[in-house]
Amino acid sequence: MGDINYEPVIRDMTWSYSRIKSFEDCPYRWYLRYIRRLKGKDLFFASYGTFMHKLIEAYYTEGKTSGELCDTYLSEFKKRVAGHAPNKKIFSNYFTSGFQYLKNIHPFPYRPLAIEKKVEFHLEGIPFLGYIDFLGEQNGDIFVVDNKSRNLKPRTKRSTPTKTDEELDSYLVQLYLYSISVEQEYGRHPSALCFNCFRSPLFIEEPFSKEAYKQSKEWLVRKVDEIAEETDFRPNMEYFKCRHLCEMQDYCEYYALSQKKR
């Protein structure tokens, strides 16, 4: 693999936050998916998140009631959520928390501007594509909302950032990148970036930071350069990620080995 130059192919790609994060998780997984273009399998966490996103979207775009959403959740869960959770406790937690959120669902505190809004832009010649789950407005201010199955924590505001602060910042990068398109369309950046952590349930509203915005743009350019210059695409063999998060496991020569390294 090291003697083949994939840079022209990589430079010609349209980028997304998930495409870059896939490389950070495992360069070989990225190679299988985006260079060899193999079709991955549906797994529990990803398909659960997709199912919940579709139901929340239907609440706003189709006017579905809580009762209708709960009925769909119960009747279609087995069909729409593929794979297996790591254990029964995790399955029960995800299933129950999803149902409870839909049972008590209520509108975000903003006037909807767009649902599942497609965003496209170029940054230093890099084409980028994404989708904003919910774009809202309140008193002239714009808010970007992302629905998350991940249980993020609000910023602690401690002098030294905690691990949960760092995790929040890593997820905020995606919304800062989406803000490039928002600024291009509306002439101003969002006032806040928000996470609807529906399993908690917790709604996090993070004030927009111009410095973090600048750093996110730099991150995009830096990561694309890093991926374009990659030649080895080495695997990152972590038991949990390989077994429960990697959709390429059926094609991966390292998968069996990753399951032994516990």
Description of each model-found segment:
Residues 1-262:
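RecB-family 4Fe-4S metal-dependent nuclease core
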